[in-house]
Amino acid sequence: MKEQQKETEQNIEEINDETVTEQIETDVDTLEKEAEVDPQQVEIEQLQSDVKELEDKLLRAQAEIQNIQQRHARELQTVRKYDGQKLAGAVLPAVDNLERALQVESEDAVTQQIKTGVEMTLGTLVQALRDNGISATGEVGETFDPTKHQAIQSVASDDVASDQIATVLQKGYMIQDRVLRPAMVAVAK
């Protein structure tokens, strides 16, 4: 019986060894097959990855170009809106001088003819300024606005309400919504 038992144990061992060996061989074959990667497949996967990366870069570049175009359009619009600002600043003293010349009283005919010519010149300049979006600011009775007006003095006045312009010492000018020169005014108390 012992011999039979030994023989049975040997048979079991041999069967186990064969089963384990077969299992190991199967596992090794499977691993070898998995390890054998098709080089074309690897290249395809790499190319697909590269394509995705390039598509992402393209989208980012297109977005950046669009942002640059929008920024340029806004800047161009601002430049166009305020393009006469420098010229207007240079012309305003001439307008002031022409207005002062018209305030001079005169009786003779020659002076009246000169005054008429000055009025026409002033009218042409004011119209040209208006056509370019430049307007005067600071009228008597207008509410004082520190962004548009510069208060030179405060005066008592029965003609206008408190915090309104009582006297305009020098007109102010605006181009669109930007102050070129604040009006110098006296404000009622």
From Swiss-Prot:
Primary localization: cytoplasm
Start-end of Acidic residues biased regions: 10-22
Compartment(s): Cytoplasm
Biological process per Gene Ontology, one example term: protein folding
Keywords: Chaperone, Cytoplasm, Stress response
Alphabetical list of PROSITE patterns matching this protein: GRPE
UniProt GO molecular function: adenyl-nucleotide exchange factor activity; protein homodimerization activity; protein-folding chaperone binding; unfolded protein binding
InterPro entries registered for this protein in UniProt: GrpE, GrpE_coiled_coil, GrpE_head
Protein function: Participates actively in the response to hyperosmotic and heat shock by preventing the aggregation of stress-denatured proteins, in association with DnaK and GrpE. It is the nucleotide exchange factor for DnaK and may function as a thermosensor. Unfolded proteins bind initially to DnaJ; upon interaction with the DnaJ-bound protein, DnaK hydrolyzes its bound ATP, resulting in the formation of a stable complex. GrpE releases ADP from DnaK; ATP binding to DnaK triggers the release of the substrate protein, thus completing the reaction cycle.
NCBIfam families: PRK14140.1, PRK14150.1, PRK14162.1
Family assignment from sequence similarity: Belongs to the GrpE family.
Subunit structure: Homodimer.
Protein name: Protein GrpE
Annotated organism of origin: Leuconostoc citreum (strain KM20)
Species classification: Bacteria, Bacillati, Bacillota, Bacilli, Lactobacillales
